[in-house]
């Protein structure tokens, strides 16, 4: 398939086109709960069908451009029940098809990585929305809550400060343009006119296998259990020639 699109305005319990790993689930109110206050550990939710990331069969060599948008809420528990600041965050990711949660990837590893090394065997591109930056536990993080672009490592290649708002709905748009190898992330809150934006150069074909899974992952520790809720999710991808000159000629 050269194109794939799906759209979830809301979710339903036992949704058959979402794969749940860990204890991720859908609430009776139609919210995809990647984590919730009563749980610790790692939770992931992936779209059930694989995505065609690139194709070498054509003369030009095709690589997928994609766009995704989703809304989510990160909400902290009452202060009297917390032992620390927010731990740890939420990530949108692309990984090998049928990817499983790696061992040793809890808490600040977001259920994606086993270490902070740039290991090409990971084959992961992720966008993290990180609410925790304690240097004692996450020495790779900047000294602020942030949005980061991760390539084969939890140590982001690009970050931008995230003005996180407890319990508010955040709207995210992520686009990837294959001809320019440009990944752009924008996060905004409906009540605000400003956006948090980060752009990074990412060679999708060099990082990912031909077929990938897309989804969300979150890790929480024992110190502070935050809710990470996905309210809606849209995704579309399209294979196109991996050559700007070819695209301009079409």
UniProtKB/Swiss-Prot annotation:
The UniProt record lists the keyword Magnesium: no
GO molecular function annotation: carbohydrate binding; metal ion binding
Protein family: Belongs to the leguminous lectin family.
SUPFAM superfamilies per UniProt: Concanavalin A-like lectins/glucanases
Glycosylation sites: 119
Keywords, alphabetical: Calcium, Glycoprotein, Lectin, Manganese, Metal-binding
Its biological purpose: Di-N-acetylchitobiose specific lectin.
Transmembrane segments: none
Pfam families: Lectin_legB
Keyword flag Metal-binding: yes
Cited PROSITE patterns: LECTIN_LEGUME_ALPHA, LECTIN_LEGUME_BETA
Name recorded for this polypeptide: Lectin 1
Coiled-coil ranges from the UniProt annotation: none
Stored Gene3D superfamilies: 2.60.120.200
Residues bound to Ca(2+): 130, 132, 138, 141
Residues noted as binding Mn(2+) in the record, renumbered to the chain: 128, 130, 141, 146
């Amino acid at each position: 398939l050269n194109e794939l699109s799906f759209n979830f305005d809301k979710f339903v319990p036992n949704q058959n086109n979402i794969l749940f790993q860990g204890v991720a689930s859908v609430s009776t109110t139609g919210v995809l709960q990647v984590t919730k206050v009563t749980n610790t550990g790692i939770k992931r939710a992936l779209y059930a069908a694989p995505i065609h990331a690139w194709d070498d069969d054509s003369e030009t060599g095709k690589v997928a451009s994609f766009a995704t948008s989703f809304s989510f809420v990160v909400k902290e528990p009452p202060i009297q029940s917390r032992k620390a600041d927010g731990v740890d965050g939420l990530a949108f990711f692309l990984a090998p098809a049928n990817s499983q949660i790696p061992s040793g990837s809890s808490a600040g590893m977001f259920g994606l990585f086993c270490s902070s090394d740039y290991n090409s065997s990971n084959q992961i591109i992720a966008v993290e929305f990180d609410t925790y930056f304690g240097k004692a536990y996450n020495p790779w993080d900047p000294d602020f809550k942030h949005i980061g672009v991760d390539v084969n490592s939890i140590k982001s290649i690009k970050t931008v400060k995230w003005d996180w708002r407890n319990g508010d709905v955040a709207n995210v748009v992520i686009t990837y343009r294959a001809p320019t190898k440009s990944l752009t992330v924008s996060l905004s809150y409906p009540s605000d006119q400003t956006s948090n934006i980060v752009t990074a150069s990412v060679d999708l074909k060099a990082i990912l296998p031909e077929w990938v899974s897309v989804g969300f992952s979150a890790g929480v520790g024992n110190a502070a259990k935050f809710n990470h809720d996905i309210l809606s999710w849209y995704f579309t991808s399209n294979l196109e020639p991996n050559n700007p000159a070819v695209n301009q000629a079409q």
